[in-house]
């Protein structure tokens, strides 16, 4: 009798135990993350990815054809946002993640557009699926996929891109600012990198055609620490919109000088210094009235979808800081989208996961997530029910980031100095 009972208990143990621990004991799915970790768009992406992985693993992992497997994150520093670092260094990191770290998928970067474009050939060579989640605003990325699908079908982007940002988000918003200010004048200050030159160049042409006065157009090398000469020119021009497009931390200096010089133009654009929740304190309130496009909802507080504040609170609790800027919510969301695709594919085989990703249709932190099946670019919208929605916020006293655009998710209105 005793032997019989022991036998039954052993059988039950074999049947029950795997269901409880299978994800931990199974071979992990390795996510390789090439990120510029010393910069905002690198570390916030890393935190977003790790938060999602922790949540998914705590729930049992990923169901791959009936077997639960955990995600494992491997982050390596590409240094591609640092001045003077060659693209080749980022490529070496991507290759190392694939060959040495045995990454099953690449998520995150490279972050700089030039590096990500160069990495596309590596991803194609090794047939490795990549989902860009941060940086890389150049429209060349998804256009290249559409032009040569068979070669670049492994490349996806789950975040916004410059052409859509400019034409469908920033230009309409600049027009609203012009109407509010009562002046159709703009002064441009851009970083000397591909996405900033392209983005501001397109905006300049569009606004000129709309009859706006372009009072100046200044380009600054990455790492510039003095913007006073350009700001003095802007001050001389009078009221208007100060369009700033910079992803470097030194843009903090620009905002401080803007306030010190009392430039009457209101800052708006894609501005690294404005994004972070600590910007108000770091600049002594110099960011007041400044506005930035953080590309995706969830990078500033709003009720875009039921996911948005759930993510916002979870990130804040996990990292002790609110979501910090562009790349945060999209990096978090990419892990859930990848999980969903793997589970529908029932395998890690690239061709089947690609087809599953192309069929993605799920609500997320910043709206409905779908990919264009030809270009693998996430489909944008101004309504989160229809697609991936952006978020433009303004710093307002006493130190809050207030989402002011688009109207579908806005929690406040633009205030003028």
Per-range role (PLM):
Residues 32-50, 76-83, 87, 110-112, ...:
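Extracytoplasmic "Venus flytrap"
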Residues 20-32, 63-72, 175-185:
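Immediate post-signal peptide segment of exported/extracytoplasmic ligand-binding proteins
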Residues 42-64, 201-208:
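Short, polar/charged alpha-helical segment
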Residues 103-217, 266-292:
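Extracytoplasmic ligand/sensor domains, especially the bilobed periplasmic-binding protein
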Residues 315-325, 339-404:
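Segments of small-molecule ligand-sensing domains
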Residues 160, 258-332, 343, 404-413:
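Extracellular/periplasmic periplasmic-binding protein-like sensory domains
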Residues 26, 40-47, 62-146, 158, ...:
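Beta-alpha junction/loop-to-helix N-cap segments that form part of ligand/metal-binding clefts
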Residues 1-30, 98-100, 417:
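Short, low-complexity disordered leader/linker segments with a strong preference
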């Amino acid at each position: 009798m005793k032997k019989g009972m022991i036998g039954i208990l052993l059988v039950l143990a074999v049947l029950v135990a795997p269901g409880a621990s299978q994800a931990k004991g199974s071979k992990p799915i390795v996510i390789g993350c090439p990120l510029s970790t010393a910069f905002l768009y690198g570390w916030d992406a890393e935190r977003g990815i790790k938060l999602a992985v922790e949540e998914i693993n705590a729930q049992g992992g990923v169901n791959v054809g009936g077997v639960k497997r955990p995600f494992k994150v491997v982050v390596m520093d590409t240094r591609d946002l640092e001045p003077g670092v060659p693209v080749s260094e980022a490529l070496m990191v991507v290759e190392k993640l694939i060959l040495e770290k045995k990454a099953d998928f690449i998520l995150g970067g490279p972050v700089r557009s030039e590096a990500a474009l160069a990495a596309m050939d590596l991803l194609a060579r090794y047939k490795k699926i990549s989902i860009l989640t941060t940086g890389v605003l150049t429209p060349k990325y998804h256009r290249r996929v559409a032009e040569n699908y068979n070669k670049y079908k492994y490349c996806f982007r789950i975040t916004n891109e410059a052409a859509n940002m400019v034409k469908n988000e920033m230009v309409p918003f600049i027009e609203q600012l012009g109407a509010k200010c009562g002046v159709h004048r703009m002064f441009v200050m851009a970083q000397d990198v591909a996405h900033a030159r392209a983005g501001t160049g397109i905006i300049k042409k569009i606004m000129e055609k709309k009859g706006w006065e372009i009072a100046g157009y200044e380009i600054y090398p990455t790492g510039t620490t003095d913007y006073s000469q350009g700001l003095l020119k802007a001050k001389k021009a009078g009221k208007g919109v100060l369009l700033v497009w910079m992803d470097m931390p030194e843009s903090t200096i620009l905002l401080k000088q803007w306030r010190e010089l009392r430039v009457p133009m209101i800052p708006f654009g894609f501005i690294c210094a404005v994004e972070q929740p600590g910007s108000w304190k770091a600049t002594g309130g110099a960011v007041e009235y400044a506005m930035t496009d953080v590309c995706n909802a969830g990078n500033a507080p709003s009720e875009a979808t039921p996911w948005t504040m759930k993510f916002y609170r979870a990130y804040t609790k996990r990292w002790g800081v609110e979501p910090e800027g562009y790349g945060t919510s999209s990096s978090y969301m990419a892990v859930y989208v990848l999980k969903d695709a793997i589970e529908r594919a029932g395998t890690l085989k690239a061709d089947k996961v690609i087809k599953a990703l192309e069929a993605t249709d799920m609500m997320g932190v910043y709206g409905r997530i779908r990919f264009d099946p030809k270009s693998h670019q996430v489909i944008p919208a101004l309504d989160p029910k229809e697609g991936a929605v952006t978020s433009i916020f303004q710093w307002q006293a006493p130190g809050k980031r207030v989402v002011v655009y688009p109207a579908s998710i806005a929690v406040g209105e633009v205030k003028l100095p």
